[in-house]
A protein has these predicted regions:
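ATP-dependent carboxylate-amine ligase catalytic core
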Residues: 18-24, 49-152, 241, 245, ...
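Extended acidic/charged loop-beta regions that coordinate divalent cations
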Residues: 94-104, 109-139, 177-233, 275-276
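Short internal beta-strands
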Residues: 131, 167-171, 319-323, 346-355
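Short glycine-dipeptide loop
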Residues: 127, 163-167, 315-316
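A short helix->loop->beta-strand "cap" motif at the edges of active sites that frequently abuts
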Residues: 26, 161-166, 183-186, 347-348, ...
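Short acidic-hydrophobic, aromatic-tinged amphipathic segments that line or gate anion-handling sites
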Residues: 372-378
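Short, basic phosphate-binding NTP loop
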Residues: 1-32, 39-52, 64-66, 71-72
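Nucleotide phosphate-binding/pyrophosphate-handling subdomain across enzymes
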Residues: 217-219, 230-349
Length: 378
């Protein structure tokens, strides 16, 4: 019964969302990929919301319920039937009566299973599609026949791009660029490689003192974005990691596609705060610093996190707490082994959590990390 009711609710709010798009005709920026969607979506919103009335997907809500709700400007009612009824009534009022509606929607669009994005792409026609990263082993691969099938699914939104629309592509990700070879749309590429249209680089970790500490710890990162002969400095505080630069570069590319001045883009990004759980810096007790990357665990995210930990110059021990990387299917054991081997070269103490992460702990031990430097919890 619950499943039937959920399907009915999704059908109603999707129908309302379609009518809302038809009535108000907003422009749409869709963000797809396996890594960095939420960070990229938020950075894009920061750039364009200062110039256009803009609405974005909340948090990491990116499925067949969340997307219509974002279009309608309604909250997720979760398991409250009265709030769902209220949402459906408000959706009808949005369609029936004139409202002030956003000029731009920035939608994060995810796919856990085959057909998820293809279904959405049949009724959403974006003006801009951003493809972030796939990596060597994308998350959710467990539910797809092959990596190519997953890439095609997540990339299907690009095929729904409006005539005259723009693709924003991660130039450093070979799977992204190979997929885009078959597409004829206008494009702007971004990345660290010199061949990109928007080139990020010259990045370094900044250091400072936190309250109640006499020691210097990482405070953020600084980097530059080069585009069309201009070199723009960007400073990020409160978070760290190479992976944060990609969302900023993608947002810069979107701003460029929309005709926003590069100085205005950089000023907006200077005030941007990355989402929680993505390499956020949290001062701890007893002269410690916590790097909070707890939102999700994937091969790309763990690799980038360990690289960042490796590059930090700071007193004291470096400790990594690694959990299971889910939904990797046949790649699970090998990827957990890789993380253990990598961690053994970076940390003085490794803590693993989860059954799959037993493999991580064992690989770190085999790679030379001492037994008393590894703690394993199921």
């Amino acid at each position: 019964m619950k499943k039937i009711l959920k399907q009915a609710v999704v059908a109603v709010i999707t129908w309302e969302a379609k009518l809302a798009l038809r009535r108000y005709k907003p422009k749409i920026a869709a963000v797809v990929g396996s890594v960095g969607k939420t960070s990229t979506k938020d950075a894009i919103y920061t750039v364009i919301s200062g110039h256009f009335f803009t609405r974005k997907s909340q948090k990491s809500f990116n499925n067949d319920i969340a997307i219509p709700l974002t279009i309608l400007g309604l909250p997720n009612a979760w398991s409250n039937p009265f709030l769902w009824l209220k949402n459906m009534i408000e959706g009808l009022l949005l369609i029936a009566l004139p409202h002030k509606y956003p000029e731009w929607l920035v939608l994060e669009i995810g796919a856990d299973r085959p057909g998820d994005i293809e279904k959405i792409s049949k009724w959403i026609r974006p003006d801009v599609v951003v493809i972030t990263r796939f990596g060597d082993v994308p998350v959710h691969i467990e539910f797809f026949p092959s990596i190519e099938d997953l890439v095609n699914e997540k990339g299907s939104m690009a095929r729904a791009l409006k005539r005259g629309g723009t693709l924003i592509l991660n130039h450093d990700d070979k799977r992204v660029m190979d997929f885009a070879d078959s597409l004829l749309s206008s494009r702007i590429t971004y990345g660290f490689s010199p061949g990109a249209d928007v080139v990020a680089g010259h990045d370094r970790i900044t250091y400072g003192m936190y309250d109640e500490s006499d020691l210097e710890f990482p405070y953020g990162i600084e980097f530059r974005i080069d585009h069309a002969g201009n070199s723009i400095p960007i400073s990020l505080q409160g978070a760290i990691g190479h992976q944060h630069i990609y969302p900023y570069a993608a947002a810069f590319a979107v701003g460029t596609a929309l005709g926003i001045n590069s100085v205005a883009i950089s000023e907006a990004l200077a005030a941007h705060i990355p989402p929680n759980g993505r390499m956020r810096l949290l001062p701890g007790v007893n002269d410690t610093l916590i790097i909070d990357d707890t939102y999700n665990s994937s091969p790309v995210a763990v690799q980038e996190g360990l690289k960042t930990l490796r590059d930090i110059v700071a007193p004291g021990r470096k400790i990594a707490i690694l959990g299971d990387m889910m939904e990797l299917g046949e790649y699970s054991k090998e990827e957990h082994q890789k993380m253990g081997e990598m961690a053994s070269k970076v940390v003085r103490l490794l803590v693993t959590v989860g059954i799959r992460s037993r493999v991580t702990a064992a690989a770190a031990l085999d790679a030379g990390l001492s037994d008393d430097a590894i703690l394993q919890f199921d």
